[in-house]
Amino acid sequence: LIDDDVIAYMRTLTDAQKAAAAAVQEPNDGRYILSLGTQAYVFSYYPSSRISAWSTYDLGFEVSDYVAMDGKVYARAGDTIYLLGGDDGETYDAAPVVVETPYIDGRAVATWKRFTGWDVVSEGEWLVEVNTDPDRPDAWSKIGTLKDGTKATVAGLDLDMVGQSPLIKFKLTNARIGPAKLSKLIIHYTPEPSN
């Protein structure tokens, strides 16, 4: 998870790069941003939905300083100053967005399940993949692409081809320019009888 990712990345850095880490709290929504080497780790927390998540960004440059001022965040890298989100707060590059959930067990980790479907509230276009084998964490099966233009919608996909497993995790990738949002992800399953 995030600790493993950060520790593995830190092992690739020099002591000077580790000591030069920079951080800031985004003034509008309270996100914590930590830059370490050329990576930025961002912690987001949404109390009303009880969701907390880490995002990782490959900046391609090392941030030496952050400043939060007048509701905006500025980052310095060498002799260049960057304004996160641009002047309007809505300007971003076309880098793909990848959302990966941890393994989900439905609060019944020892119960085998037949996954029968799922519901999602989303905006934008998302490639959806699943993994049901913790021994092969990089083995993903494509189950479809959500395409709905730019409006937030509820969609359902049939997951019966996934088969049986006590766990499932999702990877959703958006590679299109424009808004992209995932608001809810609900999994439907039936418990399988034990042998």
Where are these regions (language model features)?
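Surface-exposed loop/edge segments in extracytoplasmic proteins
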Residues: 50-57, 135-145
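Acidic, low-complexity/disordered segments
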Residues: 76-96, 151, 165, 172-176
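Short beta-strands within extracellular/lumenal beta-sheet-rich domains
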Residues: 89-113
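Beta-sandwich interaction modules
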Residues: 106-109, 140-190
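Short edge beta-strand/loop segments characteristic of extracellular beta-sandwich folds
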Residues: 117-121
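Short, surface-exposed beta-strand/strand-loop-strand elements in extracellular ectodomains
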Residues: 126-136
